[in-house]
Each structure stands twice: as structure tokens, then as C-alpha cells.
Amino acid sequence: MKDKNINSTSFSISKASKAINSYLQLFPEQQWNEVIKITLLFGIDCIQEHFALSTPRIDQLRNIIIHPESSPLDSILTKTPLKNNIINNNQNFNNKINHQHNHNFKYQQDENNNTDDEQEQEQEQQQKQNEIINKITTPIKTPSPPPPPQTSQTSQTSSTSFSIKSNNKTNNNNNNNNNNNNNNNNPFSTITPIHKNHQNSISTSSSKQLRSSLKNTPSKFAFFTSSTSSENNNNNNKNINNGNNNNNNDGGDINRNDSSSNNNNNTHNSTLFIDDDDGDNNDEINDENDINSNNLTFSSSTKSKKINNNNNSIDSNNTNINNNNNNYNNSINKLSGRESKVEFNEDRNQYSIYSRGDTSSSNNSDLIFENNNNNNSSIYNESATQVEIFYDKNGQPINHLYQEFQFQQHQNGDQNNNSQFLDESMLKSNNSSNNNNNNKNNNNNNNNNNNNNNNNNNNSSSNRNSSINNGNNQSSLFYNSASTNQNNNNNNITTSLNYKVISSPLKNLNLNPTTTNEQISKSVNFDRNQNQKSPFLNNTSMPNINFNEQSQQQSQNQYYQQQQQQQQQQSNNSMNQSINYKDINPSFLSSTPLEFNDTVDTSGSSLKYSTSSNNSKGFSNISNNSKKIFDKSNFNLGSMGNSSFGMSNFNSTSFGASTGGASHLTHTFHNNGNSDGDDDQSNNSNSLFYTPRSTHIMNSMNSNFNHHHNNNNQLFNNSGSNKQMGFPIPPNAVPIHNHTHHHYHNGKGNNTDQELEIIDLEDQPTRFNNKNNNNSNGFTSNKRFYNQH
């Protein structure tokens, strides 16, 4: 032979087959199995040395040789998803061999013309190998048959259980024995399903993973909404999953048979997956493209987590509120802008949600809504809508985002300063409900990329809420909750406040009277009780969803599947449009729909703003000291409410420009004829919540929340029939910067101050200094929140 090296490419499969057949002819047929086994075992040490194989691998090879009937190959091919891969690999290997045969064809022809000397050399070497084997084992003493001619080119088959054919494989010791009795040594064993009553827990390090994974989050993201449902399931937890498990082609859920008691709390958990819009025609949140593109949504842990995305200037803040006195525990899960806060007044069951835009961009959006519970038991059973505008890392508005903020029962938030948003029992409710022993809890969960689709309802003995937190470097701008409760009280109330969030750019809203219809043609209309339409969603109607009906879930999926073609990024060009948010009408706000409209009269020295609702009155006359305040600021100012708000009582001088320039808008809430004598309007340094984008230096602002002299005209009002006032913050308002102090002075005819101090520092609490505990219209002293960055 030309090359005796085993590594030579000339040593082909056909040649090896020929050598093996010739080798076996030296032994009786009865000994062939034993000869093959001994030969393979003898060569393992050489193989280990030659290929530097690990000991476990060598042990596995020995086990296969000794017990070929337990080889995992057949099990792998029939029981795991790797079947196609193995077959393809075999096919590729065969193709490679065929290709190799073509290269060896010439040499094989030469081989057929080998001289007698070369054949004798081969026979001598085979004889030496046989002598070595004879030293290891004692063959059965039976007369050996005469050796066949060496020129035979075909394999000799036999009736025994072992035979060799070129490029062929047969099982020995029962052909049909494909059992894998060695699963522990099978690296390709199938995934073990989650056992009954077993729940996977996610480590607290997930928050760090999520925080770090958000650094390069694309502006495109998945989103979906849900609604709560009520069921009495007789102490059963139901984990319902609409498929979407990558490793289960049957659309099932790994833990779909799981059922466990929940301390008399009946929780119905539904998982809804919709179009993730990642361009791969796969409507699963957890598909591979999502994993590779960091485009997955994630469910937050009930521990409050601050997830900071420096590139996109987006924070996801999870707020947990708990009041143990009446087992009414709520949580706010919200996706916010740069800064967010939630204010509560326990004495009056009141809360305010306030979110700011991006401090690093001029495209800021600020909005604030306050709520006055007023002991209305139906308040938290209705949906309320807050409008927020979010921006991507390029400063462009994120053009579509719906989200539901769910108020659900939770325990207190995490006390870790690195993740805490609210750390005290914030909300007290006197609501009554007949929903005894009935928890309504809807979880929107996404499975992780480890083939586990978990509705993780891990109710621990510590009464601490637990939920799935899909880490694994999954990230998204969408933020939703997944939670359950554990309380031993049979009168737990879990209701939800659904926040539908729609973004819309108001960056360059043209307030010129010559604005054309085309410039303001796009509008956003909300109707809480009917279909909801948005130009950013191609005016596609979104059906109302009832999670008690599977058909409604399907319609929700169908709705989102229609959104694959929608525009993902707004143009950098200026967009001029009006925004009308109609028929939102949350019960705790007023009986009048809230409407934002850009009907602004810029003529003369007075700027007028009004809303179209018959009962809703806006700022009828805004004085700007002969300067047009809105000319440079380019923002839309609105109000909500009806005549009971007292907003129509604001006099014409309530809104004046500061002496430092028209770009510093002063807000002084003042009721005509009810002043206690303080000249609030002359204090041009006062500014409520914000200052428009301008040359005004934010660090020099020491804003005042202004005196409210009449109890019926309080910013946070709870007297008589007056409803809570909500104040929209202009989108171009510059969020308050570091060390800015706000003082909320609440007087009852004697100018008694109650100070609200906001210290805008990372992970530092804001102190509510209560100077008048007897003032029912003011803040109480136990309120703390963080101004998130």
C-alpha cells in the first residue's frame, strides 16, 4: 500500500469493510461476535489516546460495545427532536464519503492492481494482529474452515445475529430491540416534564439580567393587552396556556396538568400570546428570532424592580401596594418615561400617577392623573385610561403601545434600595364587595428560551407574591405583570385598573390658525365601552376582551395578527396632528369624557383653550401678559373635568408669564373671590409640575405647588360633589431636574402649609413633610416615592 497511516484519506469505508470481512474469515463464525467485541475494546485505549477523549466518553463507548442492545442511537432517532438533525448529519457524512470516494477512485483502481508482494504484506500484518488477539482470548477449539480467496470483493453474510455489509448497519441480538435502558447516560434524553405541584422559581438575579439586557433593546417590541376575569374554581389553580412552547409541537403546556390548592384563593391564570412582529411569520413570543434579537417581552417579578435602559431612556417600574387592614392590596405595573411617581393619600383613598418624558431629549411627554376614591365601591371595577407618550433612543415617539396596568393583590414591595419604587403600604380602601372567595387574577406570561412555558404561581408560606420573571437576556419595552396571591382571608378583593397607553408625537404641533386639515387629520379616539381606534394601528378595531370566553381570546389574537404590516417607526419629519381622547370617562374622574383638543385661539393678547364637551370646561381665558406663551413652547395644554371641578372659576390672570420671559409658564390655581389675601399671582417663580422647553435653567427652579385657598378648588380635592382634577402636562415640558423642590401648600383660610418635597436623586426617598396632620385635604406624612431615572 502507498500509505499505511491511519489518518490517510485513502483509508475509505469500503476498504475498512473489506479489511473487517477478511479479518473475520480467520475465525469461526461462532466467534465473530466475540472477536468484534474484543477488537473494539482493545482499540478503545488507542482511540482515547489518539483522539484525546474524556473518560466519560470512553466509558460510554465501552458500554455501547458491551451492551449494543442499549445503544441510545435508536432512541435518539425516534424520541427526540434531534432526529432530523442526526439524519441530516448522516446524509452529509455520506455525501462527504461519496465525495471522498471520487477522490480515491484512482487509488482504488491502483489498489485492485496491487502486486502479490503487497497482498502478502497485508496478510502478514493481519496475522500479527490475530496473534495478539489470541494472546488475549482463548478461541473455541473447532476446526477452522479453509480461508476463502482473498480476491473476493463482496461481504459474506451469515445467519447469525451479526453480519457486516459495506455501508450497512444491522442490530445484533434482536433487531427490534430499540429500548434505551441507559437514559442517564444519554446526552440527548428528552426534557423531563414539570411534575405535579412543582413550580419553577426564578432567582432574584433576573432583575440584574434584565437590567443589563436592556442596553441594546431595539425600538421594535412585542406588546399585548389583557383583561381580568372572575371565576370561582373551588380552590383550584388553573394554568391555561395557548400553546407557543417551542419544544412541544402539540401546542400544549409543560405544566398544563398542574393543579394545587391556593389557601382558598381561586386564581384563574390565562396566558395570551400574540404577534411578536419580529418578521419571521412566527406568532410566538418565545421563538428563536426573539431570543436572538432581544425582542422578547418579559413578566416582572412582584418584587419592585427598577429596570434602567440608558440608551432608550426607558424605565420599567413595578409598584406594589398593600394594606393589611382590609386585605385590599393593589399593584401598579407601569411602563414609564424617564421619571415616574405615584402619590397616595391614605386618608382619602386617593392616588396620583405621574410620569415624565425623557430628560435627555426635547421630545418630552408628561402626564398626570389623580384619583379620588370617595368610598365608591365601583371605582376599581372600572377601567381608567391614562395617556402617555414614549420615545425611543433616537428621540422618536414609539408609535404604538397598548398596556394594561393591573391592580392586583400583592404584598409589600422589595425593600432593596436598588429596585424599590414604593416601599410602604400606600393605599387604603373601604370598598365593599360580594366577591367572596373569588380572586380575579390574570397573568400575561411569556415562556423563557429553555422550553419551559410556566405560569409560575409559587405561593410561599411567607405570604409573598411570586411570579415568573423571564430572564435569559430577554428584554422589551413592554412590561406586564404576572402574579398570584396568598391570603387566608375568604373575602379578598382583587380588581384591576386597566391602563391603555397610546403614544402620539406632539413634537411640532402647529398651533397656527392656518393649520390645514391634512396637518391635523390624524386623531386618536378612545371609547372605553366600544371599539378603540388609532391611526397608529391602521384604524383597526380592537374588540373588547372577556377572558372567560375562548372565542374572545382568539379574536384578540386575530386583532394583533393584523398589525404585522403597521409602521414601526415614525418619520423624523415634523408631524402635525390633533389628538382627541374621547369617552374615556373613568368613574373616579368625572361623568364627562376627557378630551384634548388643539382648538387654540392665538389672536390678540389672550390665549383661549376649550374642550368640545358640553359639561367640560377648560381654561376659558389665559393671560400671557401680552406675550403669546405657546409660540415658542409649541405644546398643547388641556384640562379635564366638568363644572364641579371648579376649573371654570380660574380667573384670567391665573396663568401668566414670568418676568424672566414668556417661556416660563406660571400656574397659580386661584378661585375668584375666595382668596385669603396672599398675592400668589405675583409670584412668578411658582410653577406647577413643569416648565416648558426654553432657556429657563431647570436647576435654578424652585417651584411652588401654590396655595389653594378654597377647599372646593384644591388640586387634590375630596369635598362635596367635587371630582378629582387631572392636569395634562405638555409633551415638550422639561422634566424637573436634580435638587428641584416642590412645595404643596394647602391652606384652610390660614395659609397652613403642608410641604411636598421631591428630591430627585437616584435611589433616594422623597420626603413628604406633613405640617398639618389635621388637614384632611393634604398629604399624609407616611408617603414616600422615588423619582426614577
Swiss-Prot record:
Comp. bias intervals (Polar residues): 523-549
Q: Where is this region: Disordered?
A: 107-326, 426-491, 523-625, 666-751, 765-789
Q: Which residues form a coiled coil?
A: none
Q: Where is the composition biased (Low complexity)?
A: 124-141, 151-194, 201-213, 225-270, 291-326, 429-491, 550-581, 602-617, 696-722, 766-789
Question: Which portions of the chain have biased composition (kind: Acidic residues)?
Answer: 113-123, 274-290
Q: Which domain of life is it from?
A: Eukaryota
Record protein name field: Uncharacterized protein DDB_G0286591
Organism expressing this protein natively: Dictyostelium discoideum
